Amino acid sequence: MKKFIYLMAMVCTLGFFTACSSDDDDNDKDNFVRNEKIEGTWKVQEAGMDPTTYLPTGSVVLKWEGSDDAAITIPGFNEDKPYPIKDAISTAPLILNGMLRSVLQDVTFNEKGQISATYKEEADDNDWKVANDYATYQVVNEKMITLFLNKTKITEDIDDAQEKAMITSMLDQFKTGIPVHVSYPAANKVYFYVDKDFIAPIIATLYTQVNKIPTTGMDQEDLAQFQMLKAIVNQLPTIMEKTTKFEAGLELIK
């Protein structure tokens, strides 16, 4: 159950890169359209804070516009009082950047549409590992790619049948891939992000799925994490109704 909870938490907090392809690779490698501007190894930026603006710096980027009364109540935070979404969006990267940098070092896009990443399974691990065959991409144009994750690879080490079925069901929602926008903030930077049009259906799916999950068999730690996640997810549809613009993504550097 932990892997399922972590997967949903990642979607809820970062809202990016949670989709998959069918088991077969549909890319025609001989006719692969390249975008040389994104090829190569891109590093996750160090987490920090701008000394002038006091805003968090790093690779996690969240942008939001919407109603001033949009708020979220997070159990155990802000005395369980509603917290304005605009404030949550501006402060969340301060936490997320540190978390991301501790487990993800870099991402490589090669000229054949394959993606690999250097990562740690846990932040306190000593050794970095390389993840291959989890993801591929197709170039739409200079400002858009379609990202595919390998469902079989993602779920191959899940022993619990119920958990595996849940994750597979979630991933099956996105067989056509993720439309990922690409921009170039500087010569040595690239910004990959998804927008509200992609996030909104994910939230609707999460809302449905999370309210179907039985808590039978969860240990105390899993149950506490799940209940917090469920409380957050159940507020997201209302928040999206009050959202006019949302972007979530990664700004990587060479």
Task: Specify the residue positions occupied by each region the protein language model found.
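Edge beta-strand at a domain terminus
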Residues: 134-139, 200-254
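Bacterial Sec-dependent N-terminal signal peptides
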Residues: 4, 13-45, 49, 248-254
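Post-signal-peptide N-terminal segment of Sec-exported extracytoplasmic proteins
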Residues: 41-79, 99, 103
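Short, flexible helical or helix-coil boundary motifs
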Residues: 8, 12, 92, 96, ...
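Short, P/G- and charge-enriched loop/turn segments at secondary-structure junctions
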Residues: 28, 93-95, 234-238
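Bacterial N-terminal signal peptides that target proteins for export
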Residues: 1-8
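Contiguous, well-ordered beta-strand patches that form the walls/edges
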Residues: 48, 78-205
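Flexible coil/linker segments and helix-coil junctions enriched in charged and small residues
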Residues: 64-83, 159-169, 208-235
